[in-house]
Structure formats: structure tokens, C-alpha cells
Amino acid sequence: MATDGLHENETLASLKSEAESLKGKLEEERAKLHDVELHQVAERVEALGQFVMKTRRTLKGHGNKVLCMDWCKDKRRIVSSSQDGKVIVWDSFTTNKEHAVTMPCTWVMACAYAPSGCAIACGGLDNKCSVYPLTFDKNENMAAKKKSVAMHTNYLSACSFTNSDMQILTASGDGTCALWDVESGQLLQSFHGHGADVLCLDLAPSETGNTFVSGGCDKKAMVWDMRSGQCVQAFETHESDVNSVRYYPSGDAFASGSDDATCRLYDLRADREVAIYSKESIIFGASSVDFSLSGRLLFAGYNDYTINVWDVLKGSRVSILFGHENRVSTLRVSPDGTAFCSGSWDHTLRVWA
């Protein structure tokens, strides 16, 4: 028995060293392609002028920390979820609440609008993803029509519909992501590869939508093929949890925000990190990131209650937005790019333009 154990340990050690040497070779190959820096290419690009954005609407109604939000494709409605166990659908123009659902658990960490605008999905510490159809009848009991779609073995950290209402992608504290059929609740594909809790995901913006990116507590951002379930690219340059990932509008790159107080840009074609957005004065983690419609600006919410706006090409900060009275937990640009909404632990959401 002892010799078996010894043999196993030797095999493990040799496999580990082989993996390390392969990692080294990969890094060498990546370095060969690294012939220019983004800021050098951007030197010819004109700098952005003075940039002013203000809070245009404040959405009040949650009784505790706002944890997640998403825009409807109609560019007007917003869904938000909170630690108070409530999920609220808002009219961002009037600040009216159109629907409210009380979940069976507190800490509703994930919510998403269906592409049709006719349903919302949400979940959190109940380990599952629930889909609620939205109707115009205010008296109808939404909870009665609830569908439980996804079941994880730990908390649900993020969810997103694919390009139709029929499938939903989820990320969980159990270290996996999964693709589910909404109608049957059947698991279509699972994605294993993160070494710790998965905290965020984002679907590629292409019409086919066959890839998505995820980030987690293992400091990694991973790109997945939804058809095969395989990880096709992995990036491990952050020094702490990856809290947020967002595809560049063209789909050729993505940004990440981390507890290491930096945001980073990864080019998928160059297969490497191409920019870091940080300042010595920023010492708090970035909780949420999103791009402007053109991709020139990166909005990032931080745990020091601020929102920083970065010039993606130059790597410089062009604006800093104050207003929230606690950490900014979630942030999304509207589908038409005219505004963005932020949610905070101060119990409110703010629409900026």
C-alpha cells in the first residue's frame, strides 16, 4: 500500500512539473506575438475632452443592499435584486416600480432580463435560478407562475439569458457555470475549470453567441465554448478575486474588474492582457465594469463608493463620479448607450447620463 501511495505521489509530481513546463512554453509563445503596447498604438488617437455625467434618476425602494441589476432591451425598464430578498422591475424614466417579487431567501445576488422583455430570472442563496413571466396585469400573482430552472450545490452568483428566452446561463459558488433549458429545467451543458467560486459571467455579443467569459475567486478569467463545454482561453494576471467581466462591443476583447483594485483589458486574438486601468490612489476593489457602446469608455464601480470612467485606449481616467453613499455593487450601460445605471449597498440605484 505504501509503495502505491509513493507511486501515486511521484506520478502527481511529474504531471505537475509537466503542466508547469507546458505553461512556460505557452507564455513564451504568447511573448513572441507581443510586439506592441496598446498605449503606443493609441498615441495617434486624439485624447478625450472634459467628460461630465450626472445622476438623472434615483431609484429608491429596496430595504437593503442592491446586489445586481439588468436593463431590458426596451432601453427603459430595469430589474434589480437586493439583500432584502426583493426583485423589483422599475421604469427608469418615471422611477415607478412596475413589478416586485419577494424571493424565498435573502441575498438575491443575480438577476437578468429576458431578451423579449417578457420574463426575468433571479437567484442567490437558494442555490437556484427562478424565472418569472411578466404580465401587464398588476393583480396577477407572479410567484404562482414561477419556474425553477437551475439547481447548483452552492449560491447562484450570476445569470444571463442567451440570445433567446429559451436558455439561461448561470454561475455559482460551487465553482461551475451551467447552461439550462428554461422550459424543461434540463441541464444542457456544464462548465468545469474554475478552482473556486465563480462570481461573474458575460455572453459574447455575437449573434451566434457561442462563447462566454467567466471570472472567479481563483483570480482567473476563462473563456468557454458553449457547445463543447470546454475552456478555450484562460487569463490569470489578477492578484485577487475577479468580480466582474464584460465583453468589448466587437467581441474581440473583454474587461475585468477585481478586488486587487485594477481593471484589465484582455485581447482574445492576441491571447493576452493588453491594458491595466489603475491609479496609486485607488486602493479599493472594482466590483463591476461595463463598456460604452463605442467601446472607448470603461465604466467601473468601486468599493470606495465611486465610479471611475476610463479611456480604454489611453488607459487614463477621464472622470470620477460621486453620489453613492456605500460601495457600488453593480453597473450596466443601457442598450442604446445613452445612460448607465449603478446599484449600491446604499439601497439605491442611480441612472447617469
Curated annotation (Swiss-Prot):
InterPro entries referenced in this protein's UniProt entry, alphabetically: G-protein_beta_WD-40_rep (IPR020472), Gprotein_B (IPR001632), Guanine_nucleotide-bd_bsu (IPR016346), WD40/YVTN_repeat-like_dom_sf (IPR015943), WD40_repeat_CS (IPR019775), WD40_repeat_dom_sf (IPR036322), WD40_rpt (IPR001680)
Function: Enhances GTPase-activating protein (GAP) activity of regulator of G protein signaling (RGS) proteins, such as RGS7 and RGS9, hence involved in the termination of the signaling initiated by the G protein coupled receptors (GPCRs) by accelerating the GTP hydrolysis on the G-alpha subunits, thereby promoting their inactivation. Increases RGS7 GTPase-activating protein (GAP) activity, thereby regulating mood and cognition. Increases RGS9 GTPase-activating protein (GAP) activity, hence contributes to the deactivation of G protein signaling initiated by D(2) dopamine receptors.
CDD domains per record: WD40
Gene: Gnb5
GO BP annotation list: dark adaptation; G protein-coupled dopamine receptor signaling pathway; G protein-coupled receptor signaling pathway; light adaption; negative regulation of voltage-gated calcium channel activity
Family the entry assigns: Belongs to the WD repeat G protein beta family.
Gene Ontology molecular-function annotations: G-protein gamma-subunit binding; GTPase activating protein binding; GTPase activator activity; protein-folding chaperone binding; signaling receptor complex adaptor activity
One cellular-component annotation, GO: plasma membrane
Entry keyword annotation includes Repeat: yes
Species: Rattus norvegicus
Protein name as it appears in the record: Guanine nucleotide-binding protein subunit beta-5
Main localization (coarse): membrane
WD repeat residues: 61-100, 103-142, 151-192, 194-236, 237-276, 278-320, 323-352
Gene3D superfamilies registered for this protein in UniProt: YVTN repeat-like/Quinoprotein amine dehydrogenase
Keywords from the named record: Membrane, Repeat, Transducer, WD repeat
Tissue: Detected in brain.
Keyword Lyase in annotation: no
Location of this chain's protein in the cell: Membrane
Subunit architecture: Component of a complex composed of RGS9 (isoform RGS9-1), GNB5 and RGS9BP; within this complex, the presence of GNB5 stabilizes both itself and RGS9 and increases RGS9 GTPase-activating protein (GAP) activity. Interacts with RGS7, forming the RGS7-GNB5 complex; within this complex, the presence of GNB5 increases RGS7 GTPase-activating protein (GAP) activity. Interacts with GPR158; promotes the GTPase activator activity of the RGS7-GNB5 complex in absence of glycine, in contrast GTPase activator activity of the RGS7-GNB5 complex is inhibited in presence of glycine. Interacts with RGS6.
